C-alpha cells in the first residue's frame, strides 16, 4: 500500500492516530482550515501534539469528512496528494519528508 493509500484510508476511518504515525514530532503544518478552527495559530500548527489537537477539532467539526484521491505527484522529498473532500472541494496536500516521516505539510484549497 502506498503512502497516499494509507493516508486516505486513515482519514476516511477518522483515525487521527494512524494519520499521525507518518508525521515527525517537530512537524510544521499550515492550513486555512487550521486558521479557522484554531484562530490563535494563524493557520500554522507546530509539533505533533498541536497537530493532533487541530485534526481532532476538524473531525469534530466535519463529521462527514471523506477524501477521494484524484492524483499524487512525487518530488525528491515531497509528495502532493490532490483530493476531493466531503464538500467536493478540490484540495492539495503538500507533504515534505525527512526520512520516512512528514516534517512539513501544507493544506491548499482551490480558489474559486
Give the predicted meaning of each segment.
Residues 1-28:
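Short acidic-aromatic low-complexity motifs
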Residues 7, 19, 27, 47, ...:
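Hydrophobic pocket/interface hotspot
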Residues 18, 24-70:
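A solvent-exposed, acidic/Ser-Thr-rich amphipathic alpha-helical stretch
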Residues 58-112:
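A beta-strand edge to alpha-helix "cap/lid" segment located at domain peripheries
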Amino acid at each position: 500500500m502506498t503512502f497516499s493509500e494509507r493516508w486516505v484510508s486513515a482519514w476516511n476511518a477518522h483515525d487521527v492516530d494512524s494519520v499521525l504515525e507518518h508525521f515527525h514530532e517537530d512537524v510544521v503544518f499550515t492550513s486555512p482550515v487550521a486558521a479557522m478552527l484554531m484562530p490563535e495559530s494563524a493557520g500554522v500548527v507546530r509539533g505533533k501534539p498541536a497537530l493532533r489537537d487541530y485534526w481532532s477539532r476538524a473531525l469534530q467539526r466535519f463529521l462527514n469528512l471523506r477524501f477521494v484521491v484524484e492524483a499524487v505527484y512525487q518530488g525528491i522529498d515531497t509528495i502532493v496528494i490532490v483530493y476531493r473532500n466531503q464538500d467536493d472541494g478540490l484540495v492539495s496536500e503538500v507533504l515534505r519528508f525527512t526520512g520516512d516521516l512528514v516534517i512539513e505539510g501544507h493544506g491548499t484549497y482551490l480558489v474559486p
